[in-house]
Amino acid sequence: MRPIIKSNKLDTVCYDIRGPVHKEARRLEDEGHRILKLNIGNPAPFGFEAPEEIVRDVILNLPSAQGYCESKGLFSARKAIVQHYQSQGIFGVDIEDIYIGNGASELIVMAMQGLLNPDDEMLIPSPDYPLWTAAANLAGGKAVHYRCDEEADGFPDIEDIKSKISPRTRGIVLINPNNPTGAVYSEELIQQVIELCRQHDLILFSDEIYDKILYDEAQHVPAARLSDDILTVTFNGLSKAYRAAGFRV
């Protein structure tokens, strides 16, 4: 049997925290070492459980949830999401603007597949949640990384972002609160990124999955509240704030 070779599309796709890093951790465990895995945001192994009302509602609704739902997700869930963001001062969002997926990661991949043509560029923070880089490259685009300055509390370097915008740039990814640094961005910083999107007609992709996990009186500012005049795509979910990483719809 001839060797089965993986697609060339995967040459620029790397997901170290679930690949090489995880394999090395398994190797060390096999040698008898105790490894504390912090490679992914999975709260369950550390004893954090989903709220009782979520568990109860899942059990109660299982008998009536055995078929396909609408392609965008359950109407009632999308309505609840609209109401949630209205409570945060984000208006003008319709139920038809809401898409529910099997976690934010699936929706990130779908967004990159739907947007990027060959050699289109996506500005992504460094360091980043590696799925963003992998998804952009897998879609045929090119992940271009901008610097998050360690000496400036991990905030994005606006001048570095400016220098990397090209005619091929389609959007800017903002991860706030940031994964992996934990930095929570100021309203002023978010406004600066929005202004770049405005000037260059770019889409803002705002990954806010950790928006409720805040420390030291930090306050999260949702990007969509500040960006009425540009297309802002917000990614969020139940996995982190509600400890429901294993719950899929």
What are the functions of these language-model segments?
Residues 92-98, 118-121, 168, 229-232:
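Short acidic capping loops at alpha-helix termini that bridge into adjacent secondary structure
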Residues 28-31, 139, 199-200, 230:
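Helix C-cap/helix->beta junction micro-motif
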Residues 226-249:
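Active-site PLP attachment segment
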Residues 144, 149-218:
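Active-site phosphate-binding strand-loop segment of PLP-dependent enzymes
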Residues 97, 114-136:
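Conserved PLP-anchoring active-site segment centered on the Schiff-base-forming lysine
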Residues 2-6, 11-103, 110:
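N-terminal small-domain helix-loop-helix segment of the aminotransferase-like
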Residues 137-144:
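A short helix-loop-beta submotif of the ANL/AMP-binding
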